[in-house]
């Protein structure tokens, strides 16, 4: 899997690794930059749908990156370029050669080879068709992807335009609202000016700044350091606030100090029409305020003198009031309609530009892509047709091979020719489709380039306008927010005064409220406890009554706790503002604020105080005992007494009686409602009825809450005292909390107001009930304890009950008195409560009516304002729509004019496009030339890379060796350092001065020794070098002499025949190789010796310099590979040893002279010195032995090498002598054989010729006799003479014509024979070269047998040379003999002409023919004997025929006999000529087949043929050896496979002269430049062949 990115500009697909999908888009952009050299700032990545890829997101979050849905890449650098991107035109290597190959194939004869070559050509055409089809499909696919990429960028443009329109609409709406409220803003700014002048006159109270001052001090303590600016600001702010150490100034001092600061303040006049006056007023007030602060500083007053404006300016530095106003006016000036409205018009124009449909939609692109798809479909059909035709070719070839009938070939070749023409037409159609696809892609790229440039510029303009719109929108919003701040600041003086008055009012209220609440809680608690105790006592009495659960239900309920706890604290964080501060502000504030500084008035708390007094009396009455409570206590005491006497079960009867009496008075289940009587005539109740139940029943309506454990007590019959002791106090707490919360609210509930009469009454009577309950709970607790007592304590309890009864009787009397007082108090409270209720009801009604009126007025005003605003908005929208329609009409007119201009521009563009096409064609030609240059450069680079790799490998080997040496030396150094460090001691620094003299002496000795040793080494090295050079010079001279001799021999033989020229060239190459090997060996020896000597001399020089610096003693270390490292080792070792020796000696001397006490140490030092000397001697001996061993090894190696080279040279000399002797012997044997065979052939030919001559003589005699008889019969001789002269003339003409024809035939035969002989010669040469190639490969594989192989090769070459010399000599002798016979024949012909006989030209031309053909025969011994015998026969036949002719000339007297003789001789010669040709061809083919089983092709090379590849120095390239005139060059890509070197990378001496290979691919080429790498003339047609090495074993 791969990640696909499609570059839309050029229509190319870029592939990346799938690991990038997990990474971010920024990483993908970096990968594109590193791989394809596209800068990150020029990359735009878009996916389908128009979404632009964000740099921080991962690539896998986008659903793109496949081959069908790639990521679209746009290169902005290409878009902004003036020229569109050029689509590279790819041409296949074989597509242009097809026509030439078809033409050549059509010219071939109807043979099997033609069928095979045409089948191969058909298959090639099919493969080319497949390549072309796939290439066209790729081009069309790229165009489809370009279309998708354009759609994606258009979707992105649509999104941008939509967001831009939304932003513009938002800005227009906000800006229109701003324009409507601009007058209001100016009015608010004028109000701010007046407010600032008022704030400058209002003093800031000191108590308001104490809390902020403490916070500032805390912040200063928490922060360790502050900048200077912050310190300055804090100092200024602290100067404005009174320090806590300073005593608070009195109001009088403030009154006296503040007028001094306000004397210089002058009232400002605010003009609402102009903003400048507003700004000036604000600034003047600020300056005045600054002047007030300066005046106070000048006066050095220690008082707190800060105005409200000072405090506001300090709060948000540097944003004070002045800067706020200045920013408002700056924003208003920047939002001037004269600036904004043209900009809005420009924005609308950009929206119109973004919606340019002519640029967005590429018209006709879908149709064009559909047509291209149809074209690709037709391309597929053509490929299928080519496939079928190629398969037909293959089938025909197989049939022809199976039939092996040559008669079928003409028809088959004719059909093949027709099919090839069809395939060629299909090929041309495919090329046409390819050209159309490439041009279509180029045109689409050009079209997209223009549109993308438009899109880029439009989006850039939209982005710029969008940024401006965003900035203006922020400016409007900030201005509106500042206007709100201005509005708030304009109300600051009023709010300040109202807040001060409110704080003072609350302080006054808190004081009175706390006093009233404390008294109320105190009395309420007492009243609750009294009621509680009474109910407890009654419960103890009534709990066992029979009537409890049947008649009197609900007597178990308890009153809720009310006003038993103090309310929580509130308004604790209010500033400490007093009434005096308010009076101070009244005296100094200006008149504009005086209405807001009135002293607050509180409600009358007198009725509440009266209620408190009444409640106090009620509590006293509740706590006293009445008659009913007295009876209850009496009954309880009697019950306790009866319990002590009788069983506890008898106690229920009196309680039932007592409860029966009580039930007539109250019923808690249905309490009567509160009846408000007339205050003038209150209902008076008797004193006996003033019990707690009666009070509850007649005066209050409160909810009785049952005890939570009441049902459990009913079932258990026994009373749970713990549950009775629990009172529901949570209700009170919730009530108190509600009270506090309602008190804190801004609009308190009138029902829960503590000042209302209802709440006062409720709280009063709840306190009474709580007091009664507490008293009752106490009584029940006492009773419970007595009931659960033992019988033994009953007597004690009875006595106590008597005492309690007496006390209760006394308390009942007091309670009766209190109840009388309480009755009167309750009557008064009822009157007051009714009056207050009436007043509050009237007030509430009035307030409700006022609120209704005000709400109706405000609602009407709001409704009218909203109607007006809607009307204004609709009118503005109508105006805007009218303007937009006008603008649209103007735009339509402009667009029409622009369309006309665009049509003109399009015409101009068409003309420019035609010019661009011509330029494009020129550019394409240049590009093709560049491609060829690039191919050449790639070949050169390939060869250079191969050489670099070889050098790198050698370098790595050397580095590995050096690393190993370094490791070994480091280990040795570490061992030596470890040994030496153990011997160092602490007194090294003290003994350095005394050792200098000794070091100098030793240094001089060492220097002298070194100089002597260096001179000796130089002399020895020079002697060795001189000896080696002399020996090498001798060897070189001998080899050069040998080579010169060989060259002379080769040059002598090269002039004879064309066959020998090729062989001699190859042999010269062999000798060159031998010379190169010898020279390389000599050069390597010289270089090794020189490098060794140079390294040794450099090492010695470095040793001398290091000895001068470090005082070392290293004389004999000059190893070749380890010299530098061993010098370092010996330097450190010798230095440490010498220093230790000298130091120990000096220590011993000093210790003998000065310290006799340390004798033991002295002895140890001597022992150490001895050990060190022994070690030094051992090390020196080891080093000497190692050095001597190395010298021996070096000398042995040099001697071994010299012995090897001498042995090689001797072997070569011996081999050469053997070769010469063997060649001479072979030559003598060949001469003897040839002479014998020649003699035998001559004898046999003479015999045959004699027989033939006798037969011919017989025939001639018969013809002569016949002619004589005819002559005798003829009537007259004269007539015969005339007839004979005419016949002679006719015969001469015919003979001349036949002579010309015969000469032409002879020339043709000579040409054919020459060609056949050349073929035979080249085949023989190729076989020889194959043998030579095998020898060379064996040389490389077996390095030890190089010299033996060379010697064998030299022997074979010398033998072949001797044989060739013998052949040449024999042929030259035969030629000379034939020439002599020719001269004789010519003399005889001239004699015949003089004697008026017809000459015989055929006889003269025949020897020439055979003389010319004879030297062409091959030079093997087995074949030459047969050929010489044939030649002898021919010569003998010619001699006998000529002799018979000469004899018959004298005998015959008529011309007819002579004509017959000549015709006979001609027929004989023609038959012999044919026979010789057949023998020659059969022998040559048999010799070729006998040489090797696999033939070397020398013409019409096909794939799989074995060829001879030789170095052609004229063309500086490797060529295939051929006899045809066409050149076959070896492809540069095949050089490494054949182990050959290119011309640029190697010299001529180091390049191999020939090699055998197999043809893998062949392509037809033509030279398009005069200067080319093959060095052929312009227009030359040749083949370029790819080959691989041939292995004989395979």
Curated annotation (Swiss-Prot):
Residue ranges, annotated region (Disordered): 638-673
Motif (FFAT): 731-737
Self-association and partners: Part of a complex consisting of ATG13/KIAA0652, ULK1 and RB1CC1. This complex associates with ATG101. Interacts with PTK2/FAK1 and PTK2B/PYK2. Interacts with GABARAP and GABARAPL1. Interacts with ATG16L1; the interaction is required for ULK1 complex-dependent autophagy. Interacts with RNF111, SKI and SMAD7. Interacts with COP1 in the cytoplasm of proliferating cells in response to UV stimulation. Interacts with TP53. Interacts with C9orf72. Interacts with WDR45B. Interacts with ATG13; this interaction is increased in the absence of TMEM39A. Interacts with WIPI2. Interacts with TAX1BP1.
Coiled-coil residues: 859-1397, 1438-1485
Function: Involved in autophagy. Regulates early events but also late events of autophagosome formation through direct interaction with Atg16L1. Required for the formation of the autophagosome-like double-membrane structure that surrounds the Salmonella-containing vacuole (SCV) during S.typhimurium infection and subsequent xenophagy. Involved in repair of DNA damage caused by ionizing radiation, which subsequently improves cell survival by decreasing apoptosis. Inhibits PTK2/FAK1 and PTK2B/PYK2 kinase activity, affecting their downstream signaling pathways.
Pfam families (alphabetical): ATG11
Family under the similarity heading: Belongs to the ATG17 family.
GO molecular function, one term: molecular adaptor activity
Other comments on record: Probably involved in the tumorigenesis of breast cancer. RB1CC1 is frequently mutated in breast cancer and shows characteristics of a classical tumor suppressor gene.
Motif range (Nuclear localization signal): 566-569
Organism: Homo sapiens
Name of protein: RB1-inducible coiled-coil protein 1
PTM info: Phosphorylation at Ser-734 of the FFAT motif activates interaction with MOSPD2, VAPA and VAPB.
CDD domains membership: Ubl_RB1CC1 (cd17060)
SS bonds (residue pairs): none
């Amino acid at each position: 899997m791969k990640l696909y990115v499609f570059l839309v500009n050029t229509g190319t697909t870029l592939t990346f690794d799938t690991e990038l999908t997990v990474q971010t888009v920024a990483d993908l952009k970096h990968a594109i930059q590193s791989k394809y050299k596209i800068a990150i700032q020029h990359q735009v990545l878009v996916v389908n749908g128009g979404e632009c890829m964000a740099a921080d997101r991962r690539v896998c979050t986008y659903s793109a990156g496949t081959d069908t849905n790639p990521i679209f890449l746009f290169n902005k650098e290409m878009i902004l370029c003036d020229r569109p991107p050029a689509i590279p035109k790819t041409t296949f290597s074989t597509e242009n050669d097809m026509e030439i190959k078809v033409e050549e194939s059509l010219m071939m004869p109807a043979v099997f080879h033609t069928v095979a070559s045409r089948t191969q050509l058909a298959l090639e055409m099919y493969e080319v068709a497949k390549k072309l089809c796939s290439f066209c499909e790729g081009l069309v696919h790229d165009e489809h992807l370009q279309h998708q990429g354009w759609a994606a960028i258009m979707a992105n443009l649509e999104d941008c335009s939509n967001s831009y329109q939304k932003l513009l609409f938002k800005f227009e709406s906000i800006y229109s609202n701003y324009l409507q409220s601009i007058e209001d803003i100016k009015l608010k700014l004028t109000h701010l000016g007046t407010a600032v002048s008022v704030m400058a006159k209002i003093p800031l109270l000191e108590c308001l700044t104490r809390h902020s001052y403490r916070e500032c001090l805390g912040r200063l303590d928490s922060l360790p350091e502050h900048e200077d600016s912050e310190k300055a600001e804090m100092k200024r702010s602290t100067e404005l606030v009174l320090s806590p150490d300073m005593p608070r100034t009195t109001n009088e001092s403030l009154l006296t100090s503040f007028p001094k600061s306000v004397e210089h303040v002058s009232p400002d006049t605010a003009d609402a029409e102009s903003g400048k006056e507003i700004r000036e007023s604000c600034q003047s007030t600020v300056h005045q305020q600054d002047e007030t602060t300066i005046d106070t500083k000048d006066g050095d007053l220690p008082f707190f003198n800060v105005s409200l404006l000072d405090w506001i300016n300090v709060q948000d530095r540097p944003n004070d009031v002045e800067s706020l106003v200045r920013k408002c006016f700056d924003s208003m000036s920047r939002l001037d309609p004269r600036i904004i409205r043209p900009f809005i018009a420009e924005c609308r124009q950009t929206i119109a530009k973004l919606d340019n449909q002519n640029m967005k939609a590429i018209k006709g692109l879908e149709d064009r892509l559909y047509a291209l798809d149809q074209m690709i479909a037709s391309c597929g059909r053509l490929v299928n047709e080519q496939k079928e035709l190629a398969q037909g070719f293959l089938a025909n070839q197989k049939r022809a091979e199976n039939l092996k009938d040559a008669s079928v070939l003409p028809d088959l070749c004719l059909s093949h020719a027709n099919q090839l023409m069809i395939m060629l037409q299909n090929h041309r159609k495919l090329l046409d489709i390819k050209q159309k696809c490439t041009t279509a892609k180029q045109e689409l790229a050009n079209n997209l380039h223009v549109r993308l440039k438009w899109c880029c510029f439009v989006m850039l303009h939209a982005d710029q306008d969008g940024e401006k719109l965003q900035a203006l929108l922020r400016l409007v919003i900030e201005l509106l927010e500042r206007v709100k701040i201005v509005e708030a600041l304009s109300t600051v003086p009023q709010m300040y005064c109202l807040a001060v008055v409110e704080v003072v009012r609350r302080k006054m209220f808190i004081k009175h409220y706390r006093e009233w609440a404390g008294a109320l809680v105190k009395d309420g608690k007492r009243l609750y406890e009294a009621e509680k105790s009474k109910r407890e006592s009654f419960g103890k009495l009534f709990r066992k009554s029979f009537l409890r659960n049947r008649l009197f239900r609900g007597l178990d309920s308890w009153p809720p706790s009310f006003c038993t706890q103090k309310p929580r604290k509130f308004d604790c964080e209010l500033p400490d503002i007093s009434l005096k501060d308010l009076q101070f502000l009244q005296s100094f504030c200006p008149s504009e604020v005086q209405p807001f500084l009135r002293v607050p008035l509180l409600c009358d708390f007198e009725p509440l105080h009266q209620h408190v007094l009444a409640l106090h009396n009620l509590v006293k009455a509740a706590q006293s005992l009445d008659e009913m409570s007295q009876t209850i206590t009496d009954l309880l005491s009697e019950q306790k007494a009866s319990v002590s006497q009788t069983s506890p079960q008898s106690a229920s009867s009196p309680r039932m009686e007592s409860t029966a009496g009580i039930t007539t008075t109250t019923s808690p289940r249905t309490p009567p409602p509160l009846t408000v009587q007339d205050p003038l005539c209150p209902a008076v109740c008797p004193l006996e009825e003033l019990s707690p139940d009666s009070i509850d029943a007649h005066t209050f309506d409160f909810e009785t809450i049952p005890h939570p454990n009441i049902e459990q007590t009913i079932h258990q019959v026994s009373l749970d005292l713990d549950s009775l002791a629990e009172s529901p106090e949570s209700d009170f707490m919730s009530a108190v909390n509600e009270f506090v919360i309602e008190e804190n609210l801004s609009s308190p509930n009138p029902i829960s107001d503590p000042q209302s009469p209802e709440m006062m009454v409720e709280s009063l009577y709840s306190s009474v009930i709580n007091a009664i309950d507490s008293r009752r709970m106490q009584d029940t607790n006492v009773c419970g304890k007595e009931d659960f007592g033992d019988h033994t304590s009953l007597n004690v309890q009875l006595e106590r009950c008597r005492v309690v009864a007496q006390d209760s009787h006394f308390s009942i009397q007091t309670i009766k008195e209190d109840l009388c007082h309480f009755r009167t108090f309750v009557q008064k409270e009822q009157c007051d409560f009714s009056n207050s209720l009436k007043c509050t009801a009237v007030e509430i009604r009035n307030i409700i009516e006022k609120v209704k009126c005000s709400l109706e007025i405000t609602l009407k005003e709001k409704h009218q304002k909203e109607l007006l605003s809607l009307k204004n908005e609709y009118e503005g929208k109508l105006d805007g729509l009218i303007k937009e329609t006008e603008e649209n009409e103007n735009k339509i007119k402009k667009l029409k004019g622009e369309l006309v201009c665009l049509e003109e521009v399009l015409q101009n563009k068409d003309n420019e496009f035609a010019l661009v096409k011509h330029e494009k064609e020129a550019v394409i030609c240049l590009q093709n030339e560049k491609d060829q240059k690039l191919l050449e450069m790639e070949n050169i680079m390939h060869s250079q890379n191969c050489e670099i790799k070889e050098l790198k490998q050698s370098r790595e080997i050397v580095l590995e060796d050096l690393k190993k040496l370094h490791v070994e030396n480091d280990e040795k150094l570490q061992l030596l350092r470890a040994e030496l460090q153990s011997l160092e001691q602490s007194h090294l620094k003290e003994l350095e001065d005394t050792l200098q003299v000794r070091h100098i002496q030793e240094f001089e000795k060492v220097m002298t020794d070194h100089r002597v040793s260096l001179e000796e080494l130089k002399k020895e090295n020079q002697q060795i070098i001189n000896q080696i050079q002399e020996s090498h010079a001798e060897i070189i001279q001998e080899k050069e002499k040998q080579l010169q001799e060989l060259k002379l021999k080769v040059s002598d033989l090269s002039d004879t025949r064309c066959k020998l020229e090729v062989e001699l060239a190859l042999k010269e190459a062999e000798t060159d190789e031998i010379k190169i090997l010898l020279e390389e060996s000599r050069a390597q020896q010289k270089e090794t010796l020189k490098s060794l000597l140079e390294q040794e001399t450099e090492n010695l020089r470095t040793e001398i310099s290091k000895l001068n610096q470090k005082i070392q003693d290293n004389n004999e270390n000059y190893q070749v590979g380890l010299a530098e490292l061993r010098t370092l080792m010996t330097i450190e070792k010798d230095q440490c040893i010498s220093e230790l020796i000298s130091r120990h000696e000096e220590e011993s001397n000093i210790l003998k002279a000065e310290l006799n006490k340390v004798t033991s140490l002295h002895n140890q030092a001597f022992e150490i010195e001895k050990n060190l000397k022994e070690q030094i001697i051992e090390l020196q001996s080891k080093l000497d032995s190692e050095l001597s061993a190395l010298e021996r090894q070096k000398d042995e190696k040099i001697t071994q090498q010299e012995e090897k080279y001498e042995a090689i040279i001797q072997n070569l000399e011996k081999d050469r002598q053997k070769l010469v002797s063997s060649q001479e012997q072979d030559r003598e044997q060949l001469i003897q054989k040839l002479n014998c065979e020649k003699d035998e052939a001559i004898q046999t030919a003479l015999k045959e010729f004699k027989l033939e001559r006798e037969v011919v003589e017989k025939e001639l005699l018969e013809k002569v006799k016949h002619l004589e008889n005819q002559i005798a019969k003829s009537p007259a001789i004269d007539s015969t003479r005339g007839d004979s002269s005419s016949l002679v003339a006719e015969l001469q003409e015919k003979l001349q014509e036949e002579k010309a024809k015969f000469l032409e035939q002879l020339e043709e035969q000579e040409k054919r024979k020459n060609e056949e002989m050349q073929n035979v010669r080249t085949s023989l040469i190729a076989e020889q070269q194959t043998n030579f190639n095998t020898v060379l490969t064996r040389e490389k594989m077996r390095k030890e047998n190089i010299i033996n192989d060379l010697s064998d090769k030299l022997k074979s070459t010398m033998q072949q040379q001797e044989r060739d010399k013998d052949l040449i000599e024999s042929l030259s002798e035969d030629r000379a003999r034939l020439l002599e016979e020719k001269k004789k024949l010519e003399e005889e012909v001239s004699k015949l002409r003089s004697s008026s006989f017809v000459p015989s030209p055929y006889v003269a031309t025949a020897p020439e023919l055979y003389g010319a053909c004879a030297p062409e025969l091959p030079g093997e011994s087995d074949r030459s004997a047969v050929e010489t015998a044939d030649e002898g026969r021919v010569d003998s036949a010619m001699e006998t025929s000529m002799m018979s002719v000469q004899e018959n000339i004298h005998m015959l007297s008529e011309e007819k006999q002579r004509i017959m003789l000549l015709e006979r001789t001609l027929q004989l010669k023609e038959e012999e000529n044919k026979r010789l040709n057949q023998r020659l061809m059969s022998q040559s083919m048999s010799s070729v087949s006998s040489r090797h089983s696999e033939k070397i092709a020398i013409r019409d090379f096909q794939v799989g043929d074995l060829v001879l590849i030789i170095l052609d120095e004229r063309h500086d390239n490797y060529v295939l050896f051929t006899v045809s005139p066409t050149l076959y060059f070896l492809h540069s890509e095949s050089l490494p496979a054949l182990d050959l070197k290119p011309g640029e990378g190697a010299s001529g001496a180091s390049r191999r002269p020939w090699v055998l290979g197999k043809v893998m691919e062949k392509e037809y080429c033509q030279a398009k430049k005069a200067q080319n790498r093959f060095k052929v003339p312009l227009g030359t047609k040749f083949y370029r062949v790819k080959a691989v090495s041939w292995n004989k074993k395979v």
